[in-house]
Structures are given as structure tokens and as C-alpha cells.
Amino acid sequence: MKWKIARARTTKITRATTAARHDLEHYCRDLNSWPRSWMGLEKDLPPGEQLLALFRPFLENLATSDLSPKTIQKHVDNMWALGGEFIRDLHSDSSLRKKPVELVLRQMIEYGGPLLYHGREDQQRSFDSTCRKFHGFLTKTARGRSRSPTNSPDQAGF
């Protein structure tokens, strides 16, 4: 029996140069209309617009990431679903309207996402993954905002 010598196959394609990078508009062409698409009543529009302001930096970060276009699109779709579920929760619990949108959102996605209204198990897993990723992004960027030169331990004046 002849033994083949295992050797690594090399490719002449440089993946870094062939991977097309897209901007946010490529993945969500109608991003500015998301709040209207989530809206059930006119009073849903302001929280929807606040959500979009929270979503946009995360979506821009995704669009410029090294993730595959298919994965990025899946995350974008899940973020749109998160907005819809958020507005649905506002309808089912009117006391949430009195709280800041960011606080309600953080509580909603702290351990994954809310249950999807008409979602299959695989969709729920994907949705939860996106929500955890978004929660991590919010936490990381909040830490970055809270650090200012005057809050540095070196300059605290102890």
C-alpha cells in the first residue's frame, strides 16, 4: 500500500484582497425606515428612532468587521427583529414607556434576546447570539464613554 505524504495545500488566491468590504447601506438599504416598520401606533415612532440611534454604531461596526457578508446580513436581520420585539413589549407593558429606551433594551438583551413572536428554535438561537453580541458591544462602548481624562486614576488627586 502506498502512503501519501500529507502536505498543506496552498492557494494562489489572497483572500484579504478578494473579500469585498461593504458599507452599512449594502446590508440595510432602508435603515432609516426601520422605526416606521416597527410602529403600530404613532407613539411608537420616538422610541423606534431612539432604538435606531443605539443600533446604528453596532450595525456600522458589523459592516466593517471581518465577518462574512452572510453572517453580517443575519445579524442585521436579527437587529431589525429586535426592534420589532422591543415595540411589541411596549404595547404589552405600558410602564416600559416611562423608562429610558436604553435601560429597557439592556434589560431585554442582557442574557440573550426576548422570545421571538413567531420564531423557530434555530431562529431563536441566531437571534439570541446577535443580542448577546449587541449587549457586549453596548457594554464595551459604555465603558469607553465613561473613561475620560479627568476620571483617570493617575489624575484623581488622591
Where are these regions (language model features)?
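Charge-rich, intrinsically disordered N-terminal extensions
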Residues: 1-158
